């Protein structure tokens, strides 16, 4: 019997390791989606820079999270013999890999907001600080119970802050960090003339659409695999993700009046919003959550660019920041059993946790980017921006003229 139990335990550990490894690879692939979404949106003279930022940011994120960030979040260090950290078929290692892909999404989100005028090396420095310290602080508070906030919310309001796959922990955090960076950078040259918005058309709708589709497919790994074990897998998460994606698509199509940029960001808005409550909501609630997010993105992107003069190139603040906030709140609404959900959530806890995420992101964003701006500078020179980051930073364009 002991041998049988040992064999069963080994099978469980190996299956869970494979499961979360597949999830990590799927979310890793989403970074290609971030890259092509940005490549398709920016002007051609900044496409190489977009690709280079996403890959470089991921590399820096890995180092920052491996050596510092993961320890801050979960108190786990890998500075031990390989025989120790490879226990249970290396489940702890692939869990780190999976959560790393979440952490690395933060600078990938920011990259889209600061595109076309941010300096390359200072952004890598910002990535290191954000992934090593700011993101892990809030991640640990929510997903590891650090500092006792979750226990206090549970005792005071009957439920802790619920964010199953990161509407607030990942997306709102990235979006509000990006807002701080965008405000400190200022708009691109020529974006506003005499107070009026000047249109900068996307360089490639096909690349933009490709990026959107890669993100959509990978998102099912992002959400479903957030269970982190086979025993915790729920088909409800998959279907809710699907319904929110569809709701966001249809809403953006209607409100955006057939604009392909809005259309291909609509499903992403829905998926951002459903992350928090995808394991709790009824599919109809998920559809409503996604639809509201899709419309919210279109309205707020238009207002931010035209009325508020916030030159957020990919609209990452409305897409991730505002839709992430909506996702945290929506979980407290549509996750209630009275709304067809599984229950076990408190709207007050959701509001407190979401607000804390926004505050941490804004304070951290202004601290990091403000310090770098003061000490080293954030922005390309006027001449560098005019010629584009491809030639100014990387000395090569996206397309050869030969």
Could you tell me what each predicted segment is?
Residues 1-402:
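Hydrophobic alpha-helical transmembrane bundles of multi-pass membrane proteins
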């Amino acid at each position: 019997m002991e041998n049988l139990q040992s064999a069963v335990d080994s099978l469980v550990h190996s299956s869970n390791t494979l499961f979360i490894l597949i999830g990590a690879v799927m979310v890793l692939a989403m970074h290609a989606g971030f890259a092509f979404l940005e490549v398709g949106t920016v002007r051609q003279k900044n496409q190489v820079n977009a690709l280079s930022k996403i890959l470089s940011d991921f590399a820096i994120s890995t180092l920052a999270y491996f050596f510092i960030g993961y320890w801050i979040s979960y108190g786990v260090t890998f500075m031990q013999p390989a025989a120790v950290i490879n226990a249970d078929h290396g489940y702890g290692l692939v869990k780190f890999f999976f959560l790393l892909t979440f952490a690395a999404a933060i600078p990938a989100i920011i990259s889209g907001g600061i595109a076309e005028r941010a300096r390359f090396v200072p952004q890598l420095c910002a990535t290191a600080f954000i992934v090593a310290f700011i993101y892990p602080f809030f991640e640990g508070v929510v997903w590891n119970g650090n500092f006792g906030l979750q226990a206090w919310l549970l005792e005071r309001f009957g439920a802790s802050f619920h964010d199953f796959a990161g509407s607030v922990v990942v997306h709102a955090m990235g979006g509000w960090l990006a807002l701080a960076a965008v405000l400190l950078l200022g708009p691109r040259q020529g974006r506003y003339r005499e107070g009026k918005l000047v249109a900068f058309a996307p360089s490639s709708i096909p690349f933009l659409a490709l990026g959107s589709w890669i993100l959509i497919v990978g998102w099912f790994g992002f959400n479903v695999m957030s269970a982190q074990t086979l025993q915790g897998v729920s088909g409800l998460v998959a279907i809710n993700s699907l319904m929110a994606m569809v709701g966001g698509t249809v809403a953006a199509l209607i409100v955006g009046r057939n604009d392909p940029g809005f259309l291909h960001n609509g499903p992403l808005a829905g998926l951002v919003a459903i992350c928090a409550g995808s394991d709790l909501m009824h599919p109809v609630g998920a559809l409503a959550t996604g639809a509201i997010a899709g419309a919210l993105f279109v309205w707020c992107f238009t207002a931010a660019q035209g009325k508020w003069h916030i030159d957020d190139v990919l609209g990452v603040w409305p897409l991730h920041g505002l839709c992430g906030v909506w996702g945290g709140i929506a979980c407290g609404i549509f996750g209630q059993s009275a709304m067809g959900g599984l229950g076990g959530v408190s709207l007050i806890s959701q509001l407190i946790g979401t607000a804390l995420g926004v505050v941490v992101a804004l304070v951290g964003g202004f601290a990091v980017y403000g310090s770098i701006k003061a000490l080293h500078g954030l922005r390309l020179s006027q001449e560098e921006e005019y010629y584009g980051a491809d030639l100014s930073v990387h000395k090569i364009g996206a397309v050869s003229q030969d």
